[in-house]
Regions:
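Active-site cofactor/cluster-binding pocket
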Residues: 1-131, 203-208, 335, 501
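Short acidic, glycine/serine/threonine-rich loops at helix termini
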Residues: 4-9, 35-38, 183, 198-200, ...
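N-terminal leader/propeptide and maturation segments of large enzyme subunits in energy/redox metabolism
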Residues: 73-74, 359-429
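Flexible inter-domain linker/hinge segments
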Residues: 87-88, 92-172, 180-182, 201-216, ...
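Iron-sulfur cluster-binding cysteine motifs and their immediate structural context
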Residues: 158-159, 172, 183-203, 229, ...
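Thiamine diphosphate
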Residues: 304-320, 329-342, 427-492, 528, ...
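Phosphate/pyrophosphate-binding betaalpha-module
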Residues: 478-525
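Conserved small/polar residues in nucleotide/adenosyl-binding loops
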Residues: 535-543
């Protein structure tokens, strides 16, 4: 009860006391672990509900629940059935009533919250919209709160402020055992475990409890650390699964609280080291790139976000994403809480949009054609300015470099920045065409257009549009999250499901074979297809 009082805020205490609410708690997590059910608390909580709700006699509820458990799990063996029986009994027995003290009617004021820092537009969004929504008080928001978002546009990066702390256990890194392969970061679905290289000055300025190691296999100018955000971690344990040297162990979240300031310091203050010999396009090297998809609402261990996060590490600052409805649109952009974000230095990141389910491929194609049209207009103006007598030697040099690299997404980044600087000088000197180009400057750099969606979209509902886009020969990238069933709607069979596959809502098993989307795409002869899985050779993904 004392711990509960510490965690409840003053408003909650007063509301409970003033309304004479009967308050109960149950330590379902410890009970589940004790029984052998791991983190599965649903059965325990269900029986606790029946104990308190009084919708039927509790002995009848227990009888029905145990009958359902036997029917559901008997094929998995008596031991599993018995564990569920114990969970049902535990839910009834472990409910604890909290005696609400009189002092809660006039509770002490909460300690003042630390002022949020970061991009002003994101902090404003979190304070004005995300906070009320997170408190289940979104209905109190006036229409005027959404006036500047009438077109549906939201700034990205708000997920970093949620800090939900939902994991029971989180990773702890052992620098002595670590071989610095970065496999743990490579598979992390929520970007909550990240490697960093630090200078001596960055190490000195860090929190005292930060652990570091010399770089391997050969010590260099930088120190290496692997940091975890315990308040963002979902506790899936994928990092442990892929670690070849047992350098990661799962520890109670409370024991790792001191790691949060370390992670926050590293994210905000440690720069990427471009001279450390790390190749961006290798599994190890890619993980030193800032992930521009972080702390999403996807399920613990979700592989979809692992792949999407990796793509943002390779192309994120130049990405346009057209996203089909499905799991990837739910974790990709829940209202006001975009997990996509911007590079901490350039302030650029993926631009994300969701159209109708069946129109996603066409929507993505429209993104490519539309931005290319605007870019071509700007490029023609740049050529005209460079050809004029008034163009400076510096402008001509910047324009030449930009035009040389205009078809290479990576190589075009720095020349675009240099050209914009020269355009600003020319505009200040009165060049009207430079002002026209600057009005379209966001389109100057070569973009990487991506179309995201699941197999329900790609194989079934949106296949006609996808086939049209693949056949068009346009320069777009398509990422299909092939879960071999309709995941977001609960588990129906799709054309991606294998013969005999049993899904939640296809219990009889699929009678036909899996559709070969890759062979259909390859039949055109000019579409590059790459099935990837990080459970196999990880280098294939970055390639």
């Amino acid at each position: 009860d004392e711990e509960l009082a510490h965690h409840l805020n003053a408003d909650a205490k007063k509301y409970i006391a003033d309304n004479n609410i009967q308050l109960y708690t149950i330590n379902a997590i410890d009970k589940a672990i004790e029984i052998g059910m791991g983190k599965r608390t649903n059965t325990i909580l269900q029986s606790a509900f029946f104990k308190l709700a009084d919708v039927m006699p509790i002995d009848k509820a227990v009888e029905y629940m145990k009958a359902a458990a036997k029917k559901s799990y008997s094929k998995k063996g008596d031991a599993v059935v018995e564990m569920n029986y114990k969970a049902i009994d535990a839910g009834v027995d472990a409910v604890h009533k909290v005696e609400v003290p009189e002092s809660w009617k006039n509770p002490e004021a909460d300690a003042p919250k630390a002022e949020r820092t970061g991009r002003p537009e994101v902090v404003k969004l979190v304070n004005e919209l995300l906070d009320p929504i997170a408190k289940m008080d979104g209905d109190s928001l006036p229409v005027s709160a959404f006036a500047d978002k009438a077109d549906g546009q939201y700034v990205t990066g708000a997920s970093a402020y949620e800090k939900r702390g939902t994991a029971v256990t989180v990773p702890q890194w052992d620098p002595e055992k670590c071989i610095q392969c970065n496999n743990c970061a490579f598979v992390c679905s929520h970007a909550t475990i990240r490697p960093f290289l630090l200078t001596d000055d960055e190490v000195k300025a860090a929190p005292d409890n930060m652990k570091v190691a010399d770089m391997k296999p050969k010590a260099g100018a930088y120190k290496y650390t692997m940091s975890v955000s315990p308040l963002d971690c979902m506790g899936c344990g994928e990092c442990i699964t892929v670690c070849p040297t047992a350098a990661i162990s799962m520890q109670p979240q409370e024991s790792q609280a001191a790691e949060q300031p370390v992670f926050d310091y590293l994210v905000a203050n440690v720069s990427k080291k471009t001279d450390a010999g790390m190749v961006d396009t290798t599994p190890k090297g890619s993980q030193f790139n800032q992930p521009l998809l972080e702390f999403s609402g996807s399920c613990a261990g979700c592989a979809e976000t692992s792949y999407a996060r990796l793509i943002t590490q390779l192309f994120g600052e130049q990405m346009y994403i057209s996203n089909a409805t499905g799991c990837s649109s739910i974790w990709g952009n829940p209202a006001a809480t975009s997990p996509y974000t911007v590079n901490i230095n350039s302030k650029k990141g993926p631009a994300w949009s969701n159209s109708l389910f069946e129109d996603n491929a066409e929507h993505g194609l429209g993104m490519e054609v539309g931005q290319r049209y605007l870019r071509d207009q700007a490029i023609e103006l740049v050529k005209e300015i460079a050809a004029s007598d008034k163009a400076t030697a510096e402008f001509k040099a910047a324009a030449d470099k930009f035009l040389e690299t205009k078809d290479d997404t990576k190589a075009n980044v720095e020349p675009t920045t240099a050209l914009i600087a020269e355009l600003e000088k020319a505009a200040a000197a009165g060049c009207e065409k430079s002002k026209e180009v600057l009005a379209k400057k966001d389109y100057l750099g070569k973009k990487s257009v991506w179309i995201f969606g699941g197999d329900g979209w790609a194989y079934d509902i949106g296949f006609g549009g996808l086939d049209h886009v693949l056949a068009s020969g346009e320069n777009v990238n398509v990422m299909v999250f092939d879960t071999e069933m309709y995941s977001n709607t609960g588990g129906q069979a799709s054309k991606a499901s294998n013969i005999g596959e049993v899904c939640q809502f296809a219990a009889a098993g699929k009678e036909t074979s899996k559709k070969s989307l890759s062979e259909i795409a390859m039949s055109y002869g000019y579409v590059y297809v790459a099935p990837v899985s990080y459970t196999h050779l990880r280098a294939h993904e970055t390639e």
